[in-house]
Amino acid sequence: MTRLVLGSASPGRLKVLRDAGIEPLVIASHVDEDVVIAALGPDAVPSDVVCVLAAAKAAQVATTLTGTQRIVAADCVVVACDSMLYIEGRLLGKPASIDEAREQWRSMAGRAGQLYTGHGVIRLQDNKTVYRAAETAITTVYFGTPSASDLEAYLASGESLRVAGGFTLDGLGGWFIDGVQGNPSNVIGLSLPLLRSLVQRCGLSVAALWAGNAGGPAHKQQ
């Protein structure tokens, strides 16, 4: 049975997979994102930044599996992602504070931005890497303009501090999104169309992952 291993602690990504019929093994990745970004240099484009970060996260989780989870590493697909919002010439990750989230929302209101999600995929068989790929999906997000009181209520919820760009599509932040152009699941943190393509290229069908992963509670390891 081929397991899908999600290298992310993101509740949104887990929900996307569960709603799509997959119950993954969850092993959160531990990558120093600042170090990876610094190594890319100041001229790195958004698609490369998230793609390299996702690949690094997938590689770190794959190394963990081949070292301590060899039964799983005998036949699995590791999926890791990284999302950032590009708007007004700035690449935004998770806000570090409420004040930063407020500043981001004021700059986003009434504008459109591009949500970039890098996807890193590694196929492990017999504790060895047999396939590795990383690609980026892009979705345009059209932001509404929340009232001052609604924005403060949203910031007080704490949701903005947990997600790239300081907003969600599938949570409270969805009230302030006027629309998207492209795949909605990509905004939540994982593009199902891109993941389908990557999985098929490593020799698997998504239906095999449904049968192999659905039906039990998620097993989360930190």
Curated annotation (Swiss-Prot):
It is found in: Cytoplasm. Its EC number is 3.6.1.9. It catalyses: a ribonucleoside 5'-triphosphate + H2O = a ribonucleoside 5'-phosphate + diphosphate + H(+); a 2'-deoxyribonucleoside 5'-triphosphate + H2O = a 2'-deoxyribonucleoside 5'-phosphate + diphosphate + H(+). Keywords: Cytoplasm, Hydrolase, Nucleotide metabolism. SUPFAM superfamilies: ITPase-like. One of its GO terms (cellular component) is peptidoglycan-based cell wall. Its cofactor is a divalent metal cation. InterPro entries: ITPase-like_fam, Maf-like. The active site is at residue 82. Coiled coil: none annotated. Pfam families: Maf. Its main location: cytoplasm. One of its GO terms (molecular function) is nucleoside triphosphate diphosphatase activity. Disulfide bonds: none annotated. One of its GO terms (biological process) is nucleotide metabolic process. NCBIfam families: maf (TIGR00172). Was identified as a high-confidence drug target. Belongs to the Maf family. Nucleoside triphosphate pyrophosphatase. May have a dual role in cell division arrest and in preventing the incorporation of modified nucleotides into cellular nucleic acids. PANTHER family: BIFUNCTIONAL DTTP/UTP PYROPHOSPHATASE/METHYLTRANSFERASE PROTEIN-RELATED, BIFUNCTIONAL DTTP_UTP PYROPHOSPHATASE_METHYLTRANSFERASE PROTEIN-RELATED. This is Nucleoside triphosphate pyrophosphatase. It comes from Mycobacterium tuberculosis (strain ATCC 25618 / H37Rv). The lineage of its organism: Bacteria, Bacillati, Actinomycetota, Actinomycetes, Mycobacteriales.
